[in-house]
Amino acid sequence: MSAIAWELPEDVRAVRDGLLDFARKEILPRHETHRDLFEDPRRLYREDGRFSDALKALIDDVRRVSAKAGYYNMCVPESLGGGGLGHLAYYVGWEALFRLCGPQNWLMLYVISHWAFGPSRLLEKVTEEARERMLAPMMLGEASMCFGLSEPGAGSDAAALATKARPDGNGWRLTGRKIWTSNA
């Protein structure tokens, strides 16, 4: 059985190489500088389960510096003001970061915008008013989103979710319960 001879397109290789250089210069040193934070899980989280103030500040810093370098929003659709690079660049970028940083250095998770907590195609579905209010700070890495899917008794089974959103004349009324909200 023969292998498929295929090479990454030059533009994707250039993005990958630039991203790796960025991570070596900006992300790995931040992780090393804050090693004490990562070596003790009690320093990562507050008693209520949220990120500690120190970790939150570090994540915010990584997001901002990555946005300034053009990597944070490189795969966000052009219609939302992003770089418009496709899925191939997105996944090649993630793979490169995981290979370089490994699972122990998860600050790299905040280098490229993630659909659940950064500017993404989800913003194509919100009102123009909401997009105008939220998009610019997200593209600059100054704000992020959160994502709440999991519910008691349903977990992440979208078909079993009980939370409802109903128009109430002034907007929407949400009823239900969520657990494990990502990036809250």
Where are the predicted features?
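Glycine-rich, Trp-frequent "lid" loop and neighboring beta-strands that shape
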Residues: 82-83, 122-184
